[in-house]
């Protein structure tokens, strides 16, 4: 019998000052989590949180197992050699993402990393036993603690340095097989998040450091989300802003004129340029110099031309260049390369070894103003193909934004929302299997690298996202499927023997029926117990008080309005019905 009087249970009147997110505040106040030695990004899970995580984990495992995936468990401590094979050791150690250590000192010491992800470990496991196409496809997953050296851990469980994740890896002989598993995982993730009571969207996404081709994120919609989602209901389109595509509006009209070079001293922005020249910002071509950073090659200068009223999407630029990262060139680099200040660089700037790119917004643009590679000078009424201006290679490098027209439904405009990433699915292709030699013999007997998929869920982040969406002024509103307990029994006065005995008998009936039940038998005032029950968010509260003399108990749905008095003899049936109703409402979201 789970008695609160003999449980390690604690609540706080106020959340610590450093807690900003609602989920962080409530999970701290309700005793679900505690920071370890005051360290940002490290949290211990209390008994209540562990129950929530177990239920989330069960849902995740049920949906994964239903697709035919097999659960395994891989090493958290991973030798540097396998990460060097894939080419990611430099990436993850240079930016400090991975926690690293050595097993000794001197030249013989071996380097290791605490796994932020497990592509390399899984590839090493599989390549030792994969021989034939007849063994494919298969899908391995784990629910495992991960480590990531977040530079700015914040919002409690939303962004931590140690967290629980479900990560799965599938292996295939053909693209069609990979596509089939990808679709199955899309459905499984949709089921998972619906069962957990979340309001979410699946959006097209960038693959980031994981790499690969196709990619979708599953985003919980909430105000503290660090990601921006752009969507169009008319087209059923949704994408992370890093990936989103839109139709750029036509440039403003401009009067007739002819090519000329004009003095524009002291300007620093396109707004100043437009005002001084008397032209619309949408008729300006700005030329921005970046530096592309590569793992195995020297940095390269990159010159990007884009319309004055648009902004470069650096994720798209990095993907187009297939480089580790991009950064803006500083004034010293500009001075060395082209001897001109920012704002006056032209699309034809004579930079040695430069990669020239143009965003789609300037393709076809006419009568524009742009830099002339000379300080304090701009050219006006310029056109591609005239006066030595050659349109660079065109690519989608624009940052889509709310209000842009949808590329799939041009009559509709994109809307935006904030989201927290809970899941991410990728088509990796041979990004890891080729360098790590995860090979199989095809039907002709020739060795081929296996095609891979990768599928992650933030198991410990998920409850925090639920709390962000499901709470009120009194505390948490857990969905019935993942609540730490489904029912809390509250004898109003445990000193009254009849109340205590009735509560214990009802507890036994409920647990025999498979209902997770907590008995709050603390010698506290009923009001204190009610406040704690609301704070920790148990969906159903049953009070056994003075009405018990008339054979009645009080049942209240958390956040569901007034309590209802029912005969004690009917309480079990009533509670079963309420749980069924709450489950049905959750599944229909």
Swiss-Prot record:
Q: What is the stated purpose of this protein?
A: Catalyzes the attachment of proline to tRNA(Pro) in a two-step reaction: proline is first activated by ATP to form Pro-AMP and then transferred to the acceptor end of tRNA(Pro). As ProRS can inadvertently accommodate and process non-cognate amino acids such as alanine and cysteine, to avoid such errors it has two additional distinct editing activities against alanine. One activity is designated as 'pretransfer' editing and involves the tRNA(Pro)-independent hydrolysis of activated Ala-AMP.
Q: Name one Pfam family in it.
A: tRNA-synt_2b
| Localization annotation | Cytoplasm
- Entry's Gene Ontology cellular component terms: cytosol
Q: What is its main location?
A: cytoplasm
Cite the entry's keywords alphabetically. Answer: Aminoacyl-tRNA synthetase, ATP-binding, Cytoplasm, Ligase, Nucleotide-binding, Protein biosynthesis
- Its quaternary structure? Homodimer.
Task: Please state what the protein is called.
Answer: Proline--tRNA ligase
Q: Name one GO molecular function term.
A: aminoacyl-tRNA deacylase activity
Domain comment? Consists of three domains: the N-terminal catalytic domain, the editing domain and the C-terminal anticodon-binding domain.
Catalyzed reaction equations: tRNA(Pro) + L-proline + ATP = L-prolyl-tRNA(Pro) + AMP + diphosphate
EC number of the protein:
6.1.1.15
Q: Which family does it belong to?
A: Belongs to the class-II aminoacyl-tRNA synthetase family. ProS type 1 subfamily.
- HAMAP family according to UniProt: Pro_tRNA_synth_type1
Do you know which CDD domains this protein is assigned to? ProRS-INS (cd04334), ProRS_anticodon_short (cd00861), ProRS_core_prok (cd00779)
